[in-house]
């Protein structure tokens, strides 16, 4: 590099230092993209640009990557560190032809032919000055801010106005050694590399910016011309005896109520506010498997995000995370209750579209909403909706509402060409702002209507809320799912969309359940959730710190060595760090006496802390049931444990949306881990190591309240085999209330009528209701449930059932 070049580049860097702020995707390219630092790197960029090179050089050193200005020297041959597909675009005339850049690829391949040990990593790098997708009717603005092929003058304005929104995206490296070995090194391979690179950069831009935005009025006009809405307008006019024009005006009102009005400028402003907000609220946000979602976008999938719903913060968190992960924030289905001024208009311009909680047989509204959703899919916008329909008040997943999933499936049946993929998202927080409100609502207080004052109230209480967790779960390809459920589904494409095939509703229910299962499969076992789970299982919700840390070490090892699914995540650090983190959040009480430190939960918030336990209880329910078999039931063989767990698992699966692929192998792996941790020994059979029985006992308590509910249900079924489903639900709920009053059970879900409804539906499906031939099975499961309970609790249930039914 000449002195002149050096001075020029330093001057350019100094200017960019004040004008440019760069965000790197992914955040740690060397680690996230598995780059080998021992192998040479050459960057591939779409367009030759001095400012782009300067922006790239400003960040490479931070990540241990070579500077784009430093040439690569191989056997005394100096090679440019950057290969560009296109030359600079002059103010007048055509840009430089592609031969120069083709020659660069050819030279690189030739070097691999000469040196069989050489393996250059080609790393595609995309730079974006702002992320405005543009509008379908852009004219003057597009001419001034043309982003893909700007002249130096246009680039100057882009840096001046959008320099604080510079994104640099690194993509997976291509091994030239592999290319040379597999495909050869002649010029035709270089041509192929160039073509593939062009496609890659085009797709990458669409992932980063999204499709062109429509003019809202033009979109409305197009939707009103659709056959389904025209038909619905005619029916509305006929049924309500109004004119076609009046019915059409109603449809326009519905469209205006529903449709988003996405504004990139608002998103840019909002992300600044959200960056401040997250830094104020949380010490960090942990993200897992964002790369798999980026790849789905890159491969042309229509993405539908289906997260769990913990808090109103969910809307903001997912959009924020996706924006900084190099993806476009989705269009979000928001409840109409959030369409209040001024938040509603802001949400709408951030990509929210609003949906009524019930369509109440309103065919015109249904047609308008369905056609709008189809249009989002057709134009390639990602979509997000909460399948639970509302926020969970207990921390467990709610039973899914199937309306949006049914509409998504219906859109696929109407002939979407691109693959449609549902991406389950687990959201977790060390602190949910509304959790105290949830407790009040569960205690009978009326739910407050959303308003601006609630938002101000929440912001006023900003504090240290610990960390947030965003885990992307196992994706579900809709076309593959439909082929699995109904191999002949493609034959329905040409039929009337109003006529649903017989398999449609059952398939929707299966899909909704799978979504919830995959959300739980991506759970984050955080410091707060694990500590809450352990302390709530202890007597008086308190443990010596050393005992708590031992139990945490056991659970951390179990969840890491016997993962619930490959998509779960576990708290980083050891048990001491976990406890320190929790104490720093002021969620637990630390007291000292002469014998040491005691960690406890304030009795006033014990019920509230059950919310966090319930986020991950499904991860520990099978290990807890195994421990209960060993401690309470004194089971001594693997086969007996498997038989008991298999009896209860269908109910656990329905209640907790579990999805263990091979239950028996999972049980074996847990028992092996308990043996490895020296809690259990195995010779002729399984035996408890007495010195560690307290750890097994504590583990067993996690499932105890669940087993109490099952004992109530199966004792009732054994006494009254022909009981009606509604009576079983009611009697179970009444007995649960009595048991709770006598034994101090305060967990909200213990009294949740909806939970007993879920269980009764599953019992009917399994054939346990009104089936005399199943009485042997019912009696066996009753005996198992009774045997796993403390004697006092068991006797209360037996006596209460006998008194209730006069035996």
Swiss-Prot record:
GO molecular function: glycerol-3-phosphate O-acyltransferase activity
Any one GO biological process: fatty acid metabolic process
Motif, HXXXXD motif: chain positions: 308-313
Membrane topology note: Peripheral membrane protein
Pathway where it operates: Phospholipid metabolism; CDP-diacylglycerol biosynthesis; CDP-diacylglycerol from sn-glycerol 3-phosphate: step 1/3
Family annotation (InterPro entries): GPAT/DHAPAT, GPAT/DHAPAT_C, GPAT/DHAPAT_LPLAT, GPAT_PlsB, Plipid/glycerol_acylTrfase
Keywords carried by this UniProt record: Acyltransferase, Cell inner membrane, Cell membrane, Lipid biosynthesis, Lipid metabolism, Membrane, Phospholipid biosynthesis, Phospholipid metabolism, Transferase
Localization of this protein: Cell inner membrane
One Gene Ontology term, aspect cellular component: plasma membrane
Pfam families assigned to the protein according to its UniProt record, in alphabetical order: Acyltransferase (PF01553), GPAT_C (PF19277)
Predominant localisation class: membrane
Enzyme class: transferase
Organism superkingdom: Bacteria
Description of its domains: The HXXXXD motif is essential for acyltransferase activity and may constitute the binding site for the phosphate moiety of the glycerol-3-phosphate.
HAMAP family: Glyc3P_acyltrans (MF_00393)
Family of this protein: Belongs to the GPAT/DAPAT family.
Protein name: Glycerol-3-phosphate acyltransferase
Species whose genome carries this gene: Shewanella denitrificans (strain OS217 / ATCC BAA-1090 / DSM 15013)
């Amino acid at each position: 590099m000449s002195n002149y070049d050096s001075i020029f580049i330093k001057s350019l860097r100094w200017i960019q230092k004040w004008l440019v702020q760069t965000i790197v995707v992914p955040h740690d390219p060397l680690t996230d993209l598995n780059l080998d630092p021992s192998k040479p790197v050459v960057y591939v960029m779409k367009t030759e640009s001095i400012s782009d090179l300067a922006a790239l050089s400003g960040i490479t050193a931070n990540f241990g990557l070579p500077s784009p200005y430093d040439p690569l020297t191989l056997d005394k041959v100096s090679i440019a560190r950057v290969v560009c597909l296109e030359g600079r675009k002059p103010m007048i005339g055509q840009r430089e032809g592609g031969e120069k850049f083709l020659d660069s690829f050819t030279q690189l391949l030739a070097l691999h032919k000469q040196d069989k040990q050489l393996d250059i990593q080609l790393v595609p790098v995309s730079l974006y000055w702002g992320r405005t997708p543009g509008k379908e009717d852009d004219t003057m603005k597009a001419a001034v801010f043309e982003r893909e092929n700007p002249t130096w003058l246009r680039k100057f304005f882009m840096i001046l106005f959008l320099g604080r929104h510079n994104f640099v995206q690194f993509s997976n490296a291509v091994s030239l050694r592999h290319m040379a070995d597999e495909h050869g090194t002649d010029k035709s391979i270089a041509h192929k590399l160039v073509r593939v690179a062009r496609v890659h950069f085009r797709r990458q831009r669409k992932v980063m910016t999204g499709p062109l935005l429509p003019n809202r009025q033009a979109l409305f006009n197009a939707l009103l011309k659709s056959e389904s809405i025209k038909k619905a307008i005619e029916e509305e006019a006929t049924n309500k005896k109004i004119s076609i024009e009046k019915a059409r005006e109603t449809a326009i009102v519905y469209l205006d109520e529903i449709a988003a009005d996405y504004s990139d400028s608002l998103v840019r402003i909002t992300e600044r506010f959200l960056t401040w907000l997250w830094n104020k609220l949380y010490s960090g946000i942990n993200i897992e498997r964002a790369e798999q979602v980026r790849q789905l976008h890159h491969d042309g999938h229509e993405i539908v995000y289906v997260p769990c719903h913990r808090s109103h913060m969910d809307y903001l968190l997912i959009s924020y995370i996706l924006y900084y992960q190099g993806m476009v924030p989705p269009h979000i289905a928001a409840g109409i209750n959030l369409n209040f001024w001024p938040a509603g208009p802001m949400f709408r311009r951030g990509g929210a579209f609003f949906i009524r909680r019930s369509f109440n047989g309103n065919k015109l509204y249904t047609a308008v909403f369905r056609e709008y959703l189809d249009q989002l899919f057709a134009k390639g916008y990602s979509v997000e909706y909460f399948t639970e329909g509302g926020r969970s008040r207990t921390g467990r997943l709610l039973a899914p509402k199937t309306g949006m999933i049914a509409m998504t499936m219906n859109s696929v049946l109407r002939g979407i060409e691109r693959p449609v993929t549902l991406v389950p998202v687990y959201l977790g927080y060390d602190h949910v702002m509304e959790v105290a409100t949830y407790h009040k609502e569960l205690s009978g207080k009326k739910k407050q209507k959303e308003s601006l004052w609630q938002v101000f109230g929440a912001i006023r209480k900003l504090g240290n809320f610990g960390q947030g967790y965003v885990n992307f779960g196992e994706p579900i390809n809709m076309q593959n799912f439909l082929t699995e459920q109904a191999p002949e589904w493609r034959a329905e494409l040409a039929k009337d969309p109003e006529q649903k095939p017989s398999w449609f509703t059952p398939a929707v229910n299966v899909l909704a359940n799978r979504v919830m299962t995959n959300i739980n499969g991506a759970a984050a076992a955080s410091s707060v959730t694990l500590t809450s789970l352990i302390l709530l299982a202890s007597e008086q919700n308190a443990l010596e710190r050393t005992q708590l840390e031992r139990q945490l070490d056991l659970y951390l090892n179990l969840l890491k060595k016997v993962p619930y699914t490959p998509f779960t995540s576990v708290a980083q650090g050891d048990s001491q760090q976990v406890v320190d983190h929790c104490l720093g959040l002021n969620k637990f009480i630390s007291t000292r006496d002469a014998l040491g430190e005691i960690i406890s939960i304030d009795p006033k918030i014990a019920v509230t802390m059950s919310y966090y336990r319930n986020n991950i209880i499904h991860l520990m329910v099978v290990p807890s049931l195994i421990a209960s078999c060993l401690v309470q039931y004194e089971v001594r063989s693997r086969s007996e444990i498997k038989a008991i767990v298999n009896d209860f698992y269908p109910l656990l699966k329905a209640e907790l949306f579990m999805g263990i692929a091979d239950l028996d192998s999972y049980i074996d792996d847990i028992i092996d881990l308990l043996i490895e941790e020296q809690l259990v020994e195995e010779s002729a059979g399984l035996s408890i190591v007495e010195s560690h029985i307290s750890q097994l006992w504590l583990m067993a308590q996690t499932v105890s309240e669940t087993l109490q509910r099952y004992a109530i249900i199966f004792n009732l079924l054994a006494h009254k085999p022909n009981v009606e489903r509604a009576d079983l639900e009611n009697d179970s709920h009444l007995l649960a209330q009595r048991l709770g009053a006598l034994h101090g059970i305060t967990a909200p879900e213990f009294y949740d009528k909806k939970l007993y409804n879920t269980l009764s539906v599953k019992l009917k499906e399994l054939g346990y209701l009104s089936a005399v031939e199943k009485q042997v099975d019912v009696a066996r499961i009753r005996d198992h449930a009774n045997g796993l309970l403390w004697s006092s609790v068991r006797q209360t249930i037996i006596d209460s059932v006998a008194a209730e039914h006069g035996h």
